[in-house]
Amino acid sequence: MRFAHGGGMLDRKMILLLTLLAFLGTAACSPYLPPTTVPQSPDPSLEPFKAALQAYVDQTQPYRKQAAQAAENVPGKAAPKSSAEAAVRTRQNVLADALKTKLRPTAKQGDLFVPTAATAIRRDLVQAFAGLQHDLLTDALAEQNDTGRATSAGTPPAINEHTDAPRVPPVIAEILPPIPKQLEYAFVGRSLLLRDADAEVAVDYLPDAMPETPPAGVPGVPPPPLGAVRPPLPLPSPRGAIVFALIGDSGSGDLPQGQVAQAMLTYFTAARRFPFVLMLGDNLYDDDYTGEFVTPYKPLLDRGVKFRAALGNHDRDLQIHYKPFNMNDRDYYSFDEGNARFVALNSNHPRDPAQQKWLDGVFADAGSKWRICFFHHPLYSSGQHAAESRDVIRPALEAALVRNQVNIVFSGHEHLYERIAPQQGVRYFVSGGGGRKLYDFHPSQFDEVGISQHHFMVVQIDGDRLLFEAITPEQKLLDCGILFRTPDAQRKSLDADTLKFLAACESTRPRMTAASSR
């Protein structure tokens, strides 16, 4: 069967192809809408809560589409910034008006936070604040509350009214029941809010969700004392900074691993708390999840510290499925924390074309965030794997790291500590002193600092500044300093606390050379 079209003939296949292309083109230009299925909770008592959320999503979805389409129709929305912002505001206002006048004009407290959910949420939060995660939870709440917003304390907003109350911190959101992407948790004082993410209005609230007086500490579980030693040089504590620790080649199950783990706990409790730890590979030498991971780091795990792993040459691929390593079944992955994008690579396969292609896209929307990669094998090193670094890893990965404007790379593999001078704009650290037998250090021309000693690292990112420390099991400082993401950041004046830190840093490590800035 053929169809006449102008001066020629098109067969059915061509018609179908053109129709399909037209449909795909329309779909590609459609505004984004999140999935409409509410995530499942493992707690059966929360089924009524899930049902209430699903009803809300189903009720609002048609108006959500209308709001998104209205935003698409804002003139010049993709051009000047003001027009793009107008499109966002249009989407927000159309849906907010529909919620207030058509969809939920008589909504009241408890419509979504049904009684069984209210009971479960209050119970879980009380238990969490009374447990070993107390310090991280109170730190996170204090940080979010200290935003200068008038709504960060006091009574919750009325339902269907706009609210810019701070979001619940991720460490607390993990305790709460899962909710669809159309909604988000926020808080005002002790009240927990459900806020529509598109409309930015409160759709329900739960009074007295947060414990009234969180316990000051957890009696009976202080860290085992490490003599009378305290951390050598606590980092400054600016508002909004993110802090994390790093360990490499740690999974020995031997005494040095336990000593490094104990030093990390001492630092965590006595100096500065870090919510997560990057593991730089060789996490489990003998595939002993209990002896080489759970036992040494249990005090940190119990306090809510997350570990995020990269695979080393002694690790089995099955580790990607081990939930405490937070790899999400992937041997390369990314995540954002504060002003940084973290990218874990599998350097066991440095030339893997799929990984290389993914790396070229993962920073596409990173903007002004720090770009931080972590993986096992270093590109530059001065231990017994120096030739492998030079001849295998560097040729495979350096061009991609430079091309994607990576700021810092953390690696292990060499059982020592090194800070490498910037190479083509990229700063490299080797931190493989987490517990395995040490390697000899042979200085190279690219080394700024190097020493063969067990250690862990702590890093703090504050805007465009990054402070770092390398610390031994005896709480001695191996290295410390400051790096800057941009030349402009380097030219800005440093605050008094940072200047004090750097002065102490210089006096504490007389053998070390000063850290140069990127």
How should each PLM-predicted stretch be described?
Residues 17-27:
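Bacterial N-terminal signal peptides
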Residues 30-32:
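Bacterial signal peptide processing site
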Residues 34-74:
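Immediate post-signal-peptide N-terminus of mature secreted/exported proteins
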Residues 90-167:
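Mid-length scaffold segments of soluble, non-membrane domains
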Residues 190, 249, 281-282, 305, ...:
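Active-site glycine-centered loops adjacent to acidic/histidine catalytic or metal-binding residues
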Residues 215-291, 382:
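N-terminal active-site segment of His-dependent metallophosphoesterases
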Residues 218-228, 454-518:
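A short C-terminal boundary segment appended to hydrolase-like catalytic domains
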Residues 225-226, 272, 285-371, 384-408, ...:
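Extended active-site neighborhood of metal-dependent phosphoesterases/phosphodiesterases
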